[in-house]
Design a protein with these regions (language model features):
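Catalytic-core "active-site belt" of small-molecule-metabolizing enzymes
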Residues: 1-194
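Glycine-rich phosphate/ribose-binding loops and adjacent secondary-structure elements
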Residues: 197
Length: 197
């Protein structure tokens, strides 16, 4: 599965699904294929993205919880960067809250609280995600293939770290995307399942 996705990734093309002989059939198999893709990429991992973080997105992906994709160092772009036409197959952008950890959060059986995670967070910055897919059907290919496709991850354009973000009311914080001076999309932090934290 990872070989098919990696080949399409490098050619910036889509495929009509992962070949049946190696197509993941469950979320676990999808994440295993994603891990194999990360290993095959041979690039340093910079972080992770969450997908399907709103009820509408969960409906599109036919899931009831967010999923994870991997971001590589080459995926991170600085404020003002551009992505060339032909650099992705999916022409979309999403406004994001990005959190950069300042301490490790080791795996454990018990879920971490928001306060525990925020205590391990050093910075928050606005960002624009430029997702991409190597699957011609995109989300309709099913969550197992989407996970194998790195959760539709590709680029993340990072803004500057925000001073005083811990004191901000992030759920109520307005968010807007503008193109050529026109607002094309707007919402708030609450669009992220009630709270982007």
């Amino acid at each position: 599965a990872s070989a098919a996705i990696l080949a399409a990734w490098r050619r910036v093309e889509t495929i009509d699904g992962i070949p049946q002989a190696c197509r993941p059939a469950s979320e676990d198999e999808g994440y295993q294929a994603q891990d194999a893709l990360v290993a095959a990429m041979g690039e340093p991992v910079a972080g992770y993205k969450l997908g399907a973080t709103s009820p509408g997105a969960q409906e599109i992906f036919s899931v009831d919880k967010p999923f994870v994709g991997t971001l590589f160092e080459s995926s991170l772009l600085q404020n003002g960067a551009t992505v060339a036409k032909g650099g992705v197959t999916l022409y979309a952008v999403e406004a994001e809250f990005v959190f950069r950890f300042s301490a490790d959060i080791p795996a454990r059986a018990e879920a971490y609280s928001v306060d525990e995670v925020m205590a391990a967070t050093g910075q928050m910055m606005p960002a624009i995600e430029v997702p991409d897919t190597r699957l011609s059907e995109g989300p309709k290919a099913g969550i197992a293939q989407v996970l194998a496709d790195d959760g539709l991850a590709r680029y993340l354009v990072l803004g500057s770290p925000v001073e005083g973000w811990r004191d901000a009311d992030l759920p109520e914080h307005p968010v807007a995307i503008r193109a050529n001076g026109e607002t094309v999309s707007e919402g708030s932090g609450a669009n992220e399942l009630g709270d982007p934290r």
